[in-house]
């Protein structure tokens, strides 16, 4: 059997972490087994759906490196791939269910249903539809139609039936049909509900495995009943765990960024996010946590997907992203850094080839101190400012501040005499400052760092000074002496 899986987002907003993980797991499963991955759009919520959100979702998938073999924008033999373009298909199949006695029209008002729900809950029973319109006579139907009531279409759930799901993640799960109630498959505006449309789409598109979030498990018995009523073969199911915040509550905006677009805008790298998402509920075994997409694809199986909820740990994501930042090419990182530096006011003019080469030196140093690219603006001020302002109070926080004038004077003299400043020549000059002043260790480094950078901590001086350049280094030393 050739594996066919799908990702079917609703375009009512950006692609969120949970949706991205579902898409990734489906993609990995297809690629691991040499199958096909399909993307379609579930846009029957017409008030909230938009083409802008659809484009955002598709762009987020592409950015993560998730491609698809069939579906929206790609085409294929099983389209259309938007639900709003498939309405006639659902309506025809709904009619067939009515004709076969598997569905019926319901004229109950919201008020009547609310009273019914409340009565069931007071008795400690699950709220469900009790079938008031199950066996309406033609006269009652005609009366309701004459009153202008628009019916919904309900599926007639068989009584006393055990519905068994052999789930790849959850194992065997059973539901009793008596606890489900006759559910709506077509709304009063003749638009299909999720449970009906998803069955029709999965069947028409030849989906063999449905890999989705655990929250859909309760929908599965309803969908299985529709498959059986239409005489269709059911796909296999795998319901992956929920994603929780570090406080073990369901992940939400209060836990930080929740959409892929937000992480993209903050300057996370797609390979880091994919690595992180893959580990939200899946593990290949062992202690290793850093994997390329190719490695994950080769190892991914559903039997390694955990039942327990996955915890979204932003510290772990930051650690992973920091690792990938330090592995990435400086050229790539510099291009990513430019918009953040422009936004912070560090880059105002057009960037020349010479300036870009200098920026690469800045980024090569700063990347060692950041978890995502937006943070780079917090670590580059020392390279861009013309002058360093040091108050006497700041100077007094430095070990050996009394010797600061001596160190500044010796440094100015030795840096002035240097032909060029490289990491090696700066190391030699700092050593020479020690010999000339008779000072050692922190009594040289701290005054020198504060004098040149205005900071007490940061990258090694032999890395910073060549990038600042001779002219600005001397100017800062002169300012410090004053």
Curated annotation (Swiss-Prot):
<dbReference type="Pfam" id="PF19269">
    <property type="entry name" value="Anticodon_2"/>
</dbReference>
<comment type="subunit">
    <text>Monomer.</text>
</comment>
<dbReference type="InterPro" id="IPR020058">
    <property type="entry name" value="Glu/Gln-tRNA-synth_Ib_cat-dom"/>
</dbReference>
<keyword id="KW-0547">Nucleotide-binding</keyword>
<keyword id="KW-0648">Protein biosynthesis</keyword>
<keyword id="KW-0436">Ligase</keyword>
<dbReference type="InterPro" id="IPR020751">
    <property type="entry name" value="aa-tRNA-synth_I_codon-bd_sub2"/>
</dbReference>
<dbReference type="GO" id="GO:0004818">
    <property type="term" value="F:glutamate-tRNA ligase activity"/>
</dbReference>
<dbReference type="GO" id="GO:0005524">
    <property type="term" value="F:ATP binding"/>
</dbReference>
<dbReference type="InterPro" id="IPR004527">
    <property type="entry name" value="Glu-tRNA-ligase_bac/mito"/>
</dbReference>
<dbReference type="GO" id="GO:0006424">
    <property type="term" value="P:glutamyl-tRNA aminoacylation"/>
</dbReference>
<dbReference type="InterPro" id="IPR033910">
    <property type="entry name" value="GluRS_core"/>
</dbReference>
<dbReference type="InterPro" id="IPR049940">
    <property type="entry name" value="GluQ/Sye"/>
</dbReference>
<dbReference type="GO" id="GO:0005829">
    <property type="term" value="C:cytosol"/>
</dbReference>
<dbReference type="InterPro" id="IPR014729">
    <property type="entry name" value="Rossmann-like_a/b/a_fold"/>
</dbReference>
<dbReference type="InterPro" id="IPR000924">
    <property type="entry name" value="Glu/Gln-tRNA-synth"/>
</dbReference>
<feature type="short sequence motif" description="'HIGH' region">
    <location>
        <begin position="9"/>
        <end position="19"/>
    </location>
</feature>
<dbReference type="GO" id="GO:0000049">
    <property type="term" value="F:tRNA binding"/>
</dbReference>
<dbReference type="InterPro" id="IPR008925">
    <property type="entry name" value="aa_tRNA-synth_I_cd-bd_sf"/>
</dbReference>
<feature type="binding site">
    <location>
        <position position="253"/>
    </location>
    <ligand>
        <name>ATP</name>
    </ligand>
</feature>
<keyword id="KW-0067">ATP-binding</keyword>
<dbReference type="Pfam" id="PF00749">
    <property type="entry name" value="tRNA-synt_1c"/>
</dbReference>
<keyword id="KW-0030">Aminoacyl-tRNA synthetase</keyword>
<dbReference type="InterPro" id="IPR020752">
    <property type="entry name" value="Glu-tRNA-synth_I_codon-bd_sub1"/>
</dbReference>
<comment type="function">
    <text>Catalyzes the attachment of glutamate to tRNA(Glu) in a two-step reaction: glutamate is first activated by ATP to form Glu-AMP and then transferred to the acceptor end of tRNA(Glu).</text>
</comment>
<dbReference type="GO" id="GO:0008270">
    <property type="term" value="F:zinc ion binding"/>
</dbReference>
<dbReference type="InterPro" id="IPR045462">
    <property type="entry name" value="aa-tRNA-synth_I_cd-bd"/>
</dbReference>
<dbReference type="InterPro" id="IPR001412">
    <property type="entry name" value="aa-tRNA-synth_I_CS"/>
</dbReference>
<comment type="similarity">
    <text>Belongs to the class-I aminoacyl-tRNA synthetase family. Glutamate--tRNA ligase type 1 subfamily.</text>
</comment>
<keyword id="KW-0963">Cytoplasm</keyword>
<protein>
    <recommendedName>
        <fullName>Glutamate--tRNA ligase</fullName>
        <ecNumber>6.1.1.17</ecNumber>
    </recommendedName>
</protein>
<feature type="short sequence motif" description="'KMSKS' region">
    <location>
        <begin position="250"/>
        <end position="254"/>
    </location>
</feature>
